[in-house]
Regions:
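Phosphate-end processing signature that detects enzymes handling 5′-triphosphorylated RNA
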Residues: 65-68, 72-73, 124, 128-131, ...
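Secretory targeting and sorting signals
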Residues: 1-34
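Polyanion-binding and phosphate-handling cores
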Residues: 70, 89, 99-169
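Amphipathic alpha-helical segments
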Residues: 60-76, 133-139, 230-247
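An N-terminus-focused feature that recognizes amino-terminal "leader" regions
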Residues: 37-109, 114-117
Length: 315
């Protein structure tokens, strides 16, 4: 996902809103910090959807051409056209409800294409819950959340509404997170290859993702660990709390848990930022431990129902 492009579009459309938000985000962060020891209120509205990371070129290329990953997961290399004709080509590992999106240095334009850049989407399962998230954000001190609609072009030049996003701020160093809710127009388009709803108002992740995960080992992402600036971490905490995650301090960073996924954000300088680790649940227990070196990363699968993927910084 092109985080910089999304936020730049928002700034062009709503410059006054963005300018007014700079002072309010700090207040929201302070409120979130003060309440981190308390349990989240109400039902969970936002769930881990996906994270992306920009890796060194060696690792990105090794991932793209890995025969093992094509066995391990529902793996795709895909180019997507979004709002305003912006395009991105990513490497995707897709599970039942969650997925991982990986890029190499230079795959994305500008700031987003540098090593260590990363992002994360957390999404609703029921139509209308994004509005409640925005109410909770305002209660946390983010008085003017930034809204954005992403579209998708399936190749005919006609943009189809894809999802509505909300951000706490338009300012970030290397990492940003957004809340999102898939649009009914996207599910209604047969080219999206999505599933019928399981209940009225179903805009969930399982409906959005294909069922091809059943033919592979990987079932879902169970945790992600990313490093980002203290400012980026602080700006993410209100979104997680508004979504219903249980958030606690972890040194200079934060850990959020709920909905079967743990999100760890470590505060770090820019040269140490980026995607650090992802863990997965498997469809069936792996009888033996398998270690796969992929570029400057190491994926360990099994024994049992889990896998761990660690990403090293380039030398």
């Amino acid at each position: 996902m092109l985080l910089h492009r999304m936020l730049r579009t928002v700034m062009v459309v709503a410059v006054a809103l963005a300018a007014g938000l700079v002072g309010t985000v700090g207040g929201g962060t302070s409120t979130a910090r003060a309440e981190e020891g308390k349990p989240s209120q109400g039902r969970q509205l936002l769930f881990y959807n996906h994270a992306y990371g920009v890796l060194d070129r060696e690792t990105a290329d090794a991932i793209e051409h890995s025969a093992y990953l094509r066995e391990f997961a529902n793996f795709q290399v895909r180019t997507t056209t979004g709002s305003g004709g912006q395009t991105w080509t990513g490497r995707y590992l897709m599970g039942r409800e969650t997925y991982l999106e990986l890029f190499g240095v230079g795959d994305l334009p500008g700031q987003d294409g540098t090593f260590g850049s990363a992002g994360m989407g957390v999404s609703t399962e029921r139509a209308g819950d994004r509005a409640t998230v925005m109410e909770r954000l305002r209660a946390l001190g983010v008085t003017e959340p930034i809204e954005y609609r992403q579209t998708r072009d399936f190749g005919d030049g006609v943009p189809v509404p894809w999802f509505d996003a909300v951000f706490t701020t338009d300012q970030y160093d290397s990492f940003g997170a957004w809340g999102m809710e898939y649009r009914p127009e996207y599910f209604a388009d047969p080219r999206s290859k999505t599933e019928p709803p399981d209940y009225p108002g179903d805009v969930g992740r399982e409906r959005y993702l294909p069922d091809d995960y059943r033919d592979h080992e990987m079932r879902d992402v169970t945790s992600v660990r990313l490093a980002a600036s203290a400012r980026d971490v602080a700006n993410t905490v209100p979104m997680l709390r508004a979504g219903g995650f249980a958030v606690r301090d972890a040194g200079d960073g934060a850990v959020a848990t709920r909905g079967g996924v743990t999100i760890r954000l470590d505060a770090a300088p820019r040269d140490r930022a980026g995607l650090k680790q992802v863990t997965f649940a498997l469809n069936e227990p792996a009888g033996n431990r398998h270690k796969e070196r992929i570029g400057r990363s190491t994926l360990v699968v099994g024994p049992g129902l889990g896998a761990v993927w660690n990403f090293d910084a380039p030398k």
